[in-house]
Amino acid sequence: MAKKSLIQREMKRRILNRKYSSLRKFLREKIDKVSSLDERWKIRKNLQSLPRNSAPSRQRRRCFITGRSRANYRDFGLSRHLLREMAHSCLLPGITKSSW
């Protein structure tokens, strides 16, 4: 299981992303529309002044039960270990073990 501090840090990043996403989107659209180089630099400076952790590229997908950061399935939000356990225990509806 991941450290609690890592899980909390990821939650903080998710909250910051939601808070600043509309402003970030607005500034990016404004950069595309402006033709003056000086204006672009000013808008870029405003974009850089936003918190670093509010960028979506700083987020990492984690298992919502264990907090594991690697080998996650997007559809379930689970790591491969828990997905296997829960599928064998019939806790995930519609999931069957394949055989051919």
From Swiss-Prot:
GO terms for molecular function: rRNA binding; structural constituent of ribosome. Belongs to the universal ribosomal protein uS14 family. This is Small ribosomal subunit protein uS14c. Part of the 30S ribosomal subunit. Its main location: plastid. Keywords: Plastid, Ribonucleoprotein, Ribosomal protein, RNA-binding, rRNA-binding. InterPro entries: Ribosomal_uS14, Ribosomal_uS14_bac/plastid, Ribosomal_uS14_CS. It holds the Pfam family Ribosomal_S14. PROSITE patterns: RIBOSOMAL_S14 (PS00527). It is found in: Plastid. GO terms for cellular component: plastid; small ribosomal subunit. Binds 16S rRNA, required for the assembly of 30S particles. Gene3D superfamilies: 1.10.287.1480. It comes from Aneura mirabilis. One of its GO terms (biological process) is translation.
